[in-house]
């Protein structure tokens, strides 16, 4: 959430920066709500002061034995108006809060300006795409003989679900374990196991709600139809980041670095017709997430570090990739700056997103009221960052396609052999 003081003092500048994201700020609506708030607060204070003065006057009159009925009647009238103001003010404040909750984060200075993914800027590449001396197959055709079963997934749950069995299920698990070990043992993250179902206020904290409800899977508890809203997580960023919600942390507790492997559930609203073949876009997929809670002065450096942590996985797997900076029009709602990592997929002859790392600055912290105490004893908002380290399913796709052999077998990347019990090649079922 944006700082309301920023809008109050620099409304036109905020509007200009939001316009870079393709968002039109309704300055008139904000100004009208602000005027109403100020009028109600001013009138409430005036009425309270007048009531207090009249109450003293009543005491003086009664002390003298004089008639105070007229003044008491006036106090009664003031009380009615004061009650009306006190009831109206929270309504206006809630409208202001809802207005702010619908605004995305402001892009950092230096983020490339653009309307969509065509405005993204490549930063660097690593590795050289392999040259094949045979016709390349995609992961769907390769996986069919290795236990990747989209038909069973569709029979069980509908489109965009996958069923895995045997050696490919083992490879999927090996990838997740390898990623977790790298992030915890080499990069200093604390491994976590978090709930996959969360309450509404948790999603408000990280910015998925209220704006993106249609992207979520909603949960209805049997026998509790009147219960509160709950949702399946779309990323473990949600529970990990919210561990500091409504807390005041000691400065020396920062940075906090958390990681978790979890399934992620996304309705993919608005994605009809996109990536309908294979595992690229699924309703359920696994991901190893990285989250950092840091001092505001450290968040830009933490973002660069986090990107390096995601890159390390791809480098260990020897998968070619590139790093791009997302433009203003392609960033996520809560992000001030985002890097995407895109892995090379031979069958598509292009790079596809496999990780997204974002600095959200104080945007999520303000929504969560996550703060730390400075050396001067002042409470300030922390900065939050999140990144994929990595998306497990898309990494599986990249391994299958980049390590395929002419006979349909898959060479296991060296880094994964210990996680596969020494198995070095996946061979198609005869």
UniProtKB/Swiss-Prot annotation:
One GO biological process term is: seryl-tRNA aminoacylation
Task: Please list the GO terms describing molecular function.
Answer: ATP binding; serine-tRNA ligase activity
Residues that coordinate or bind L-serine: 235-237, 289, 388
Q: Which reaction does it catalyse?
A: tRNA(Ser) + L-serine + ATP = L-seryl-tRNA(Ser) + AMP + diphosphate + H(+); tRNA(Sec) + L-serine + ATP = L-seryl-tRNA(Sec) + AMP + diphosphate + H(+)
Which CDD domains did the record assign?
SerRS_core
**Where on this chain does ATP bind?**
266-268, 353-356
Q: Which domain of life is it from?
A: Bacteria
Instruction: Specify the enzyme's EC class, one word.
Output: ligase
Question: Recorded E.C. number(s)?
Answer: 6.1.1.11
Query: Can the keyword Manganese be found in this entry's annotation?
Result: no
User: Can the keyword Glycoprotein be found in this entry's annotation?
Assistant: no
Pathway entry: Aminoacyl-tRNA biosynthesis; selenocysteinyl-tRNA(Sec) biosynthesis; L-seryl-tRNA(Sec) from L-serine and tRNA(Sec): step 1/1
Of the GO CC terms on this record, one is: cytoplasm
Q: Which PROSITE patterns match?
A: AA_TRNA_LIGASE_II
What compartments host this protein?
Cytoplasm
Task: List the keywords (alphabetical).
Answer: Aminoacyl-tRNA synthetase, ATP-binding, Cytoplasm, Ligase, Nucleotide-binding, Protein biosynthesis
The record's family statement is: Belongs to the class-II aminoacyl-tRNA synthetase family. Type-1 seryl-tRNA synthetase subfamily.
Comment on protein domains: Consists of two distinct domains, a catalytic core and a N-terminal extension that is involved in tRNA binding.
Which NCBIfam families did the record assign? serS
Q: What is this protein called?
A: Serine--tRNA ligase
- State the organism named in the record: Azoarcus sp. (strain BH72)
Q: What gene name is given for the protein in this entry?
A: serS
């Amino acid at each position: 959430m944006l700082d309301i003081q920023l809008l109050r003092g620099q409304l036109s500048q905020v509007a200009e920066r939001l316009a870079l994201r393709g968002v039109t700020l309704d300055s008139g609506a904000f100004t009208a709500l602000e005027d109403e708030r100020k009028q109600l607060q001013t009138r409430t204070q005036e009425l309270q002061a007048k009531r207090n003065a009249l109450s003293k006057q009543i005491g003086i009159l009664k002390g003298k034995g004089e008639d105070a009925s007229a003044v008491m009647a006036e106090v009664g009238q003031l009380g009615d108006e004061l009650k009306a103001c006190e009831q109206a003010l929270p309504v206006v404040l809630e409208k202001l809060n809802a207005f702010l909750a619908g605004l995305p984060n402001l892009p950092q200075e230096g983020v490339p300006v653009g309307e969509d993914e065509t405005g993204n800027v490549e930063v660097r590449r690593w590795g050289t795409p392999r040259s094949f001396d045979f016709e390349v197959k995609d992961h769907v055709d390769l996986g069919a003989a290795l236990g990747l079963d989209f038909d069973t997934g569709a029979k069980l749950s509908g489109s965009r679900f996958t069923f895995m069995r045997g050696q490919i299920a083992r490879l999927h698990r090996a990838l997740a374990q390898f990623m977790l070990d790298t992030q915890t043992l080499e990069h200093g993250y604390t491994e976590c196991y978090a709930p996959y179902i969360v309450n509404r206020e948790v999603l408000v904290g990280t910015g998925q709600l209220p704006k993106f409800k249609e992207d979520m899977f909603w949960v209805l508890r049997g026998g509790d139809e009147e219960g509160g809203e709950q949702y399946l997580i779309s990323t473990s960023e949600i529970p990990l980041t919210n561990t500091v919600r409504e807390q005041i942390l000691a400065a020396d507790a920062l940075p906090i670095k958390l990681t978790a492997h979890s399934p992620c559930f996304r309705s993919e609203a608005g994605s009809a017709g996109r990536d309908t073949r294979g595992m690229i876009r699924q309703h359920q997929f696994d991901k190893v997430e990285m989250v950092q809670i840091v001092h505001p002065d450290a968040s830009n450096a933490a973002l660069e570090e986090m990107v390096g942590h995601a890159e390390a996985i791809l480098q260990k797997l020897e998968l070619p990739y590139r790093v791009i900076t997302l433009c203003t029009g392609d960033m996520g709602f809560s992000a001030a700056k985002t890097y995407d990592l895109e892995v090379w997929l031979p069958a598509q002859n292009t790079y596809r997103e496999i990780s997204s790392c974002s600095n959200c600055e104080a945007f999520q912290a303000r929504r969560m009221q996550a703060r730390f105490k400075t050396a001067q004893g002042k409470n300030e908002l922390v900065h939050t960052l999140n990144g994929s380290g990595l998306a497990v399913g898309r990494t599986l796709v990249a391994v299958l396609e980049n390590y395929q052999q002419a006979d349909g077998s898959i060479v296991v990347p060296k880094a994964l052999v210990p996680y596969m019990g020494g198995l070095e090649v996946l061979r198609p079922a005869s």
